[in-house]
Amino acid sequence: MVVIRLSRGGSKGRPFFNIVVADKRVRRDGRFIERLGFYNPSAKEGEEGLRIAQDRLTYWKGVGAQPSPTVDRLIKQAAQKAA
């Protein structure tokens, strides 16, 4: 099964997450199929905190990829910000 989830990066105490498409069996920060965007929870004012490639997200959801609950929340947040 293919999932859309967060892959952690950054240093200790300064998290940064890539939004990736990966096989469910692969570890959290392991191999992924495609990177769809990023989420920076510690973004300062004027910095971009969330970016998602909507066209690729639509494609992967269309072929059956399941977003994690957190990614689902971030997708809704990005949609509100864009509107």
From Swiss-Prot:
It holds the Pfam family Ribosomal_S16. GO terms for biological process: translation. Transmembrane segments: none annotated. Belongs to the bacterial ribosomal protein bS16 family. It comes from the Bacteria. GO terms for molecular function: structural constituent of ribosome. Gene3D superfamilies: 3.30.1320.10. GO terms for cellular component: cytoplasm; small ribosomal subunit. This is Small ribosomal subunit protein bS16. Coiled coil: none annotated. The gene is rpsP. It comes from Acidovorax ebreus (strain TPSY) (Diaphorobacter sp. (strain TPSY)). Keywords: Ribonucleoprotein, Ribosomal protein.
